[in-house]
C-alpha cells in the first residue's frame, strides 16, 4: 500500500522534469545568430547583410569569390541596357546588392567607404563608346583595395591569393557604384542623379592614394589617353646642356646669320631697282622680283621652320603647316621661270647689242612678264595646300607636348574632283618636282648660256673698239646668270633626294634620318635666298656701285668730304658705265644725264 506522500512526490517530480525541459528548450531557442555572414539567400535579413559587408568591405565575401559567372557578352549587354540603379542581379549573385541599392536611393551609393579607392582596368581594354574619356564630369567607377580586404578574406576562410586570382581572371563580373569626379571620398555630398546605372571602369586612369579626384595622374600600367589636368609644356631646346642643346644653339646662330644677311641683301636689291631710274630694265625687274620672293621666304618661313625644329611644334598649327610648303614651292617656281626669262633676255642682247640697248620696254610689258611668272608659280604650287596635313606623335615623356609633323596626307573629306586631282598629283609629285623645278631651269639655262656665249665671242671678233666694253659686260652678265643657276641647282638637290628616299626607301630609313634630310633641304633653300643678293653684288659692278652709293648717302662723312668737282667727275664716269651696263636701258644719246637716281 503506497504511502500517503507518494502521489505528492510523484507530482512534484513530474513538474520539475517539465520545468527543466521548458527551460532547456527556451535556452536553445534564444541562442543569437552567428555574425560571420554565413547565411545564404533570403534567409539573412538586410540589416545583417549590410553589417557583414561593412565589417568585411564590399566585394570580399566568400560568396563573391564562389559566385557562378554568367557569359561576359550577356553580362555586358545587361550593363549597357541598364538605365537606373534597379538592375537585375547576375545569376548566382548576391541579393544584398539590390537591397543596398534600394537603401542608397537613386542619388548614389552609401558614402564613407571603409578604405581608399583606386581605378581598376578591366583586362586592359577600353569600355564601349558610352563612356567619354575626355570629360572629367563623367561617372568614374571605383572598387576598394585595402588592408581590410585581406583581413575579411582571412575571416571568411578564403586565401588572398585565391581571391585575387578570381578577380584577375574574371574582372568583368564586378560591378561598382559610379561616383562623380571632383568630390572627396570622405565628403557627405552625394552625386547627381544624372549619371545612373553601373558601368565598367575605363583603364588608363588612376586616383592618388589620398583620395582626391581633382589631381589626375596617369596609370602606370597603360598608355596615356585623353586630356589630363597637368599642363603640357614645350620642350626647352637649350637646357639642360646636352648634345641636342648644342645642336639647337648651332641652328639658332646659323638662322640668325641667314636672316640678317638675307633681309638686308634682298631689301637692298629691291631698293636699288625701284629708286634708280637708270636701273629699271627688264632684267633688273626680274632680279627685283626674285629678291622679293627670297625676302618673303626668309622673313616669313625661316622663323616658323626654326621654331618647329627647336620645339617640335608649329607656331600657327595647321595654317603654318600648309602655308610654309606652299610659299617654298611657289618660290622655287618663281626662281625657275625668272632664270629662264633672264636667259632669253641675255640671248636677245647678245644677238644684237646695239638694237637691244636702243630699245626701251614700257611698264606694261614688264608687268605682263612678271604676272605670267607669278600666276604660273602660284598655280603650280597650289596642290601642296591640299596634300599637307598636321599629325601629332607622343614623345614618350610625361608632361611633354606631343611632337607635331607636317606630313603628306590627303584628307578624305575633300570633294571627289579635288580628291582625284590630289591623288594624281601625289603619284606624280616626285618626277614633277624633279623635272619642273630642277631639270628645267638647269638644263635650259646651261644650254641657253652656251649659245649666248658663242654669240658673244662672234660679236667680239667682229666688233669695233667702242663695242668691246659692252660685249665684255654682256659676258659678265651671262656668267652671273650661270652662277645663279648653279647655286639654285646645288641648293635644290637635297630636296629631290629627300623626295626619292620618301617614295622608294621610306621603310628602310629611320625617322631621324628623314628629319635630318628635311632640315638640310630647308636650310639650303634659305641659304639660296640669302646668298643670291650677295652673289649679285659681287659679280655685277653696277649693282655693287649702286649699293655703295645707297650706303654712302646715309653717312654724313661721305657728303662732307665730296666736293663739287669730284662729284661731277664721278657722276659722269658712273653714268657712262651705266650706259654700257647690261642692266640699263639708257640710250646712247642720253649721256647728258648726270644724276644716277633718287636717294635712298
Curated annotation (Swiss-Prot):
Functional summary from the UniProt entry: G-protein-coupled receptor that plays a role in several physiological pathways such as resolution of inflammatory pain and oligodendrocyte differentiation. Acts as a receptor for several ligands including prosaposin, osteocalcin or neuroprotectin D1. Ligand binding induces endocytosis, followed by an ERK phosphorylation cascade. Acts as a receptor for osteocalcin (OCN) to regulate oligodendrocyte differentiation and central nervous system myelination.
Membrane topology, from the record: Multi-pass membrane protein
Gene disruption phenotype: GPR37-deletion mice exhibit a significantly higher number of myelinated axons and thicker myelin profiles than wild-type mice. Therefore, deletion results in accelerated myelination. In addition, mutant mice exhibit enhanced Listeria monocytogenes-induced pain behaviors compared to WT.
Superkingdom of origin: Eukaryota
Residues bearing glycans: 36, 210, 227
Name of the protein this chain belongs to: Prosaposin receptor GPR37
Family membership: Belongs to the G-protein coupled receptor 1 family.
Species in which this protein is naturally found: Mus musculus
Transmembrane segments: 253-273, 287-307, 323-343, 367-387, 431-451, 481-501, 519-539
Classification of source organism: Eukaryota, Metazoa, Chordata, Craniata, Vertebrata
Subunit structure: Forms a complex with PRKN, STUB1 and HSP70. The amount of STUB1 in the complex increases during ER stress. STUB1 promotes the dissociation of HSP70 from PRKN, thus facilitating PRKN-mediated GPR37 ubiquitination. Interacts with PACRG.
Tissues in which the protein is found: Highly expressed in oligodendrocytes in the brain and spinal cord and expression increases during their differentiation into myelin forming cells.
Gene Ontology CC entries for this record: cell surface; dendrite; endoplasmic reticulum membrane; plasma membrane; receptor complex; synapse; ubiquitin ligase complex
Site (Cleavage) location in chain: 53-54, 164-165
Alphabetized SUPFAM superfamilies for the sequence: Family A G protein-coupled receptor-like
Composition-biased stretches (Basic and acidic residues): 152-173, 187-198
Record GO terms (molecular function): Hsp70 protein binding; neuropeptide binding; neuropeptide receptor activity; PDZ domain binding; prosaposin receptor activity; ubiquitin protein ligase binding
Gene responsible for this protein: Gpr37
Compartmental location: Cell projection, Dendrite; Synapse; Cell membrane; Endoplasmic reticulum membrane
Post-translational modification: The N-terminus is cleaved by ADAM10 metalloproteinase; mediating limited proteolysis leading to the release of receptor ectodomain by shedding. In addition, cleaved by FURIN between Arg-53 and Asp-54. Ubiquitinated by PRKN in the presence of UBE2E1 and UBE2L3 in the endoplasmic reticulum. The unfolded form is specifically ubiquitinated by SYVN1, which promotes its proteasomal degradation and prevents neuronal cell death.
Region feature Disordered, mapped onto this chain: 103-228
Cytoplasmic topological domain: 274-286, 344-366, 452-480, 540-600
Gene3D superfamilies to which the protein is assigned, alphabetical: Rhodopsin 7-helix transmembrane proteins
Principal location class: other
Topological domain ranges for the Extracellular compartment: 27-252, 308-322, 388-430, 502-518
